A protein has these predicted regions:
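Short hydrophobic/aromatic-rich beta-strand segments that constitute the beta-sheet cores
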Residues: 30, 57-59, 96
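A cytosolic small-molecule/anion-sensing beta-strand core signal
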Residues: 24, 51-52, 71-72, 90
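His/acidic/aromatic-lined binding-pocket segments of jelly-roll/cupin-type domains
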Residues: 38-41, 45-50, 67-68, 86
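Conserved short histidine dyad/triad with adjacent acidic residue
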Residues: 26-42
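Glycine- and acidic-residue-biased ligand/ion/polar-headgroup-sensing regions
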Residues: 44-62
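A short, N-terminal "cap"/entry segment at the start of jelly-roll beta-barrel domains
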Residues: 1-30
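Short acidic-glycine-tyrosine-enriched beta hairpin
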Residues: 62-80
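Ligand-binding loop in jelly-roll beta-barrel domains
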Residues: 80-103
Length: 103
């Protein structure tokens, strides 16, 4: 049993993570960041839940770039093949559930 206070977690570097669980090839990790990630496409599904802070999520659908602001409590689901990039608006803590070893 473990209790994690997400607001208390700060990584040593942007997108640093606290590994929470690995179940049947799926990982659950708490990330801290204050810098953008990179455009990428996951090889599996991804669940991206903002726990603290705000994140601009940019993604491409039908070749068009779109954007939405995710607030604390919001969840972004990326299906296989969804190209996307997360840009935090200040420090943010994000719970990510995805295939182990995904970008």
């Amino acid at each position: 049993m473990k209790i994690i206070r997400s607001k208390d977690f700060t990584a040593a570097r942007p997108w640093g993570a606290l590994d929470i669980a690995s179940m049947n090839g799926i990982t659950t990790r708490l990330h801290w960041t204050n810098e953008p990630y990179k455009w990428h496409v996951n090889d599996g599904q991804e669940v991206f839940a903002v726990l603290d802070g705000r994140v601009e999520m940019r993604y491409r659908e039908d070749g068009r770039e779109q954007s939405t602001i995710l607030e604390a409590g919001d969840i972004f689901y990326a299906a296989v093949g969804t190209e996307h990039v997360a840009l935090p608006i200040g420090p943010a803590r994000i719970l990510v559930v995805e295939t182990a070893g995904s970008v």
